[in-house]
């Protein structure tokens, strides 16, 4: 079975672990058994993640791709378990030395181990390699047990229009500055996907959607993760034309985001922080949207015309619990693993 998942960073990576556990992929391959024997059918499953690139930025001359790296480190077993991003056993000597020089930005730190990833990526970009090939090369080191695809090889960065807290002017800043420096706590007016007008989804991304047996939308931020993926020309059309069912998972539980600041992002675009509102924001494929099925928390409700809805536990407490979420979505879509 070919499974394609649209994901952001930390939450998306944890969701992918659940998919892997359900299908016996990646680090869970040896754990899946049938009648006491290894399940050889696990080898027939293929997992592809289409990953947000809207967070990507140039930091200290290095190309940083936070969501791609978080997925790669998480699935490869090297992520910091406390933060949910970055390297395990990270050190920060380079960051400390840059601070002594007064180098800006001082609000975004790169770990010493993490810098190795960014150096390789930047060197390959300078040599003319596209991001898709670079990501595949980086994954050779991490062996994530899934194909990680940047949605595009082109620049398509999320910027945020704010009121500057210092002088009151209205200006656009990179999403990383809004998220990391200001913690989304400044007057915010809109989001813009810079470069989208010239960007295009990669052929690999379009093929992963067209060839899938089921397409899952992880409970990632619907505005700056999934929304940024959908902003890349070609993606929405490919989803609407896909032969596979599309199953989405609500990032909102009981009116609060599963993690991160999705509620702040939704407020900016005028969408309520409810499972139903986010489902309506994505919309039904029978209409002009992208959903066939929508999973919400047991404590939530959603009535969306043209979309099959089911309430199940959505807390990703561990890969096993997440695998149950994934399984429930497949059942709702009528897909048998």
UniProtKB/Swiss-Prot annotation:
7,8-didemethyl-8-hydroxy-5-deazariboflavin binds at residue 69. Its cofactor is Mg(2+). Keywords: Magnesium, Transferase. InterPro entries: CofD, CofD-like_dom_sf, FbiA/CofD. It catalyses: enolpyruvoyl-2-diphospho-5'-guanosine + 7,8-didemethyl-8-hydroxy-5-deazariboflavin = dehydro coenzyme F420-0 + GMP + H(+). One of its GO terms (biological process) is F420-0 metabolic process. SUPFAM superfamilies: CofD-like (SSF142338). It is an enzyme of class 2 (transferase). Its EC number is 2.7.8.28. CDD domains: CofD_like. One of its GO terms (molecular function) is magnesium ion binding. Pathway: Cofactor biosynthesis; coenzyme F420 biosynthesis. Belongs to the CofD family. Catalyzes the transfer of the phosphoenolpyruvate moiety from enoylpyruvoyl-2-diphospho-5'-guanosine (EPPG) to 7,8-didemethyl-8-hydroxy-5-deazariboflavin (FO) with the formation of dehydro coenzyme F420-0 and GMP. Homodimer. This is Phosphoenolpyruvate transferase. The lineage of its organism: Bacteria, Bacillati, Actinomycetota, Actinomycetes, Mycobacteriales. The gene is fbiA.
């Amino acid at each position: 079975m070919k499974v394609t998942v649209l994901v952001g960073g930390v939450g998306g990576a944890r969701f992918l672990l659940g998919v892997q556990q359900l299908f016996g992929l990646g680090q869970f391959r040896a754990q899946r058994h049938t009648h006491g024997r290894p399940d050889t059918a696990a080898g027939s499953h293929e997992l592809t993640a289409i990953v947000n690139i809207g967070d990507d930025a140039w930091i200290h001359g290095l190309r940083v791709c936070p969501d791609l790296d978080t997925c790669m480190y998480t699935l490869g077993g090297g992520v910091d378990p406390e933060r949910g991003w970055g390297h395990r056993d990270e050190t920060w000597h380079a960051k400390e030395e840059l601070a002594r020089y007064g180098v800006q930005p001082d609000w975004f730190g790169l770990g010493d181990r993490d810098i190795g990833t960014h150096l390789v990526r930047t060197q390959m970009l300078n040599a003319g390699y596209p991001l898709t090939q670079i990501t595949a090369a980086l994954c050779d080191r991490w062996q994530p047990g899934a194909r990680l695809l940047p949605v595009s090889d082109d620049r398509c960065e999320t910027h945020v229009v704010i009121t500057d807290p210092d002088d009151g002017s209205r200006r656009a800043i990179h999403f990383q500055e809004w998220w990391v420096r200001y913690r989304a706590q400044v007057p915010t007016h809109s989001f813009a996907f810079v470069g989208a007008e010239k960007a295009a989804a990669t052929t690999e991304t379009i093929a992963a959607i067209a060839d899938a047996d089921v397409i899952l939308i992880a409970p990632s931020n619907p505005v700056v993760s999934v929304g940024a993926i959908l902003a890349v020309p070609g993606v929405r059309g490919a989803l609407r034309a896909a032969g596979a069912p599309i199953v989405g998972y609500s990032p909102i539980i009981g009116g609060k985001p599963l993690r991160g600041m999705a509620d702040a992002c939704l407020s900016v675009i005028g969408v309520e922080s409810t499972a139903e509102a986010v489902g309506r924001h994505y919309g039904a494929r029978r209409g002009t949207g992208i959903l066939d099925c929508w999973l919400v928390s047991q404590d939530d409700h959603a009535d969306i015309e043209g979309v099959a809805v089911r309430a199940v536990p959505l807390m990703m407490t561990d890969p096993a619990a997440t695998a149950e979420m994934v399984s429930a979505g497949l059942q709702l879509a009528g897909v048998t693993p």
